[in-house]
């Protein structure tokens, strides 16, 4: 068992097992842990091993090769037939041979399942409080504090500080927004972290200066044709239409749709104003985090459950250190080699898959699962699956579902608590408390701001400024790491290129002649089979760009506006949901007589009116495009089958990619076979575009196998979302009949 850990240590002398007295504190999953020594692979025998050269990290489990793994790419330890290869530079990345990992482009991606807007979080918090009050359960109530009356001088000083931090926040937000907007206009892709920062900054700007809605938004709409003309890289390069008018309309439609979606996201990011709020949420969170970090005082279970909801998956994963990311990947049997962005991306996709599975399992019931299904579900969530009884499997899975779905604890916190060195005897609240202690300080700042926004309280400008500056520093650090990787890769490639291009020397002279001094009988021959299939899966960034261009070309040939119509319908649903959430909040507050204290911000009201106007304009553009296409440009056969306008055959995709640029036949077959999940010879273009946009937003390198897994995850989320919509519709109809 010890060899599983010790074989991957960094060669710092012979390792030995430490005595139990030398064990590190429980839950020590920090930068000092040597997480390259952890091997959390299957789940049979559980032991904690400590070597001389590192501190303890993950628990270690044995693994049987006969057990199927639900992982992104099976590690070489799990499959004996997979060839090993060294790291090789490719473009500006370091990649591992085998399934190759490629960066692709895109801007928007599908929203993760269950990702709530700010108003939805406020509504859930309000419903939870009212429900506990009706049931007579425990409701968190802050201790009564003695109000100290401030002197006149102290009040003036506080006001001066408030305006100072407010103007400083406004200036910094303006600079960051201008820089990111310039990057967008010049065709650069914002990462997920940058887009989230840009969205929050725009919401802050409209909150600080509501008058900007009358100036900025109409100015942006007026300049759309100019922007499209001056910055052609803002849109995909393949708008190869025969009609200049149709091309102009499509570009205008695309930009208006993106702008309307962004403005709606900005509206949902703005918090409601609660005039009755006393600013207790920020103080309560600060006191809670001070207890678990400094004083050592144990918070109540209600406090732990209440504040744990604020540490969302995206916030937690974006701020974890690399050792913690590697530990989580090994716990979930994911690839632990790659950039931080790649590790976060595959963790995000796994958490999205687990979230969808949790809802499906909860609907069917844990008791309906077989033993193998229980083991697979527990193993996928980082829990013990082998060597335990069926009752324990059901018990720990039910506890997981209760914490995740009923108490709404983020999946990332639950997974992180299982990656730590914690005994099974600890209660869920104590496990969450120990997990929160390991999170970086920046996560606490973000959660503190979110706590005030959810309660509808006025966010302190100083706290908002600190969170913005910390997030900007993290973004700049990512850029520096990216530039450093690119420079190192270019430095490794440059000597090889210079040697291969020496003037006056033929290529044959570059290699010295080898003298055969070894007898033929002593020459060792490698009899292992050569795995040619791995080479066929190598896909470059250029080939992915060609795939994106081919999709655009095929959609143009089919005159398909399916994606635009679908996005417009989703935008209309978001607007309607926002309006319904506002009404529900007022309805919940009417139970306590506080509905008069809540109101929508001025900037939010103005933006909502502008989005409604843009939706009408987009409807008109789509109608105009359809009319243009029906005037002799659309094939009658295609017009008679609207259901298949987004479905193409594998041969059509291969033919379109060949027309753009020559690609080897085996690569085309490998790529299309990975995209054709059900092997029926057909591919949905819209689903393919969603995958490309999703990966492009993360700026990571993935393999063809992972493309198929992303498609499966998106389909699973769509299935769960359809069930939830049908359930909500049935509940609304039942409520209407009852009333």
Swiss-Prot record:
Its main location: mitochondrion. The modification Phosphothreonine is found at residue 191. Residues 229-739 are mitochondrial matrix. Residues 115-135, 445-492, 537-626, 707-738 form a coiled coil. Residues 251-536 form the Letm1 RBD domain. It is a single-pass membrane protein. Inhibited by ruthenium red or its derivative Ru360. Residues 663-698 form the EF-hand domain. PROSITE patterns: EF_HAND_1, LETM1_RBD. InterPro entries: EF-hand-dom_pair, EF_Hand_1_Ca_BS, LETM1-like_RBD, LETM1/MDM38-like. It holds the Pfam family LETM1_RBD. PINK1-mediated phosphorylation at Thr-191, positively regulates its mitochondrial calcium transport activity. Ubiquitous. GO terms for biological process: calcium export from the mitochondrion; calcium ion transport; cristae formation; inner mitochondrial membrane organization; mitochondrial calcium ion homeostasis; mitochondrial calcium ion transmembrane transport; mitochondrial potassium ion transmembrane transport; mitochondrion organization. Plays an important role in maintenance of mitochondrial morphology and in mediating either calcium or potassium/proton antiport. Mediates proton-dependent calcium efflux from mitochondrion. Also functions as an electroneutral mitochondrial proton/potassium exchanger. Crucial for the maintenance of mitochondrial tubular networks and for the assembly of the supercomplexes of the respiratory chain. Required for the maintenance of the tubular shape and cristae organization. Essential for early embryonic development. This is Mitochondrial proton/calcium exchanger protein. It comes from Rattus norvegicus. The gene is Letm1.
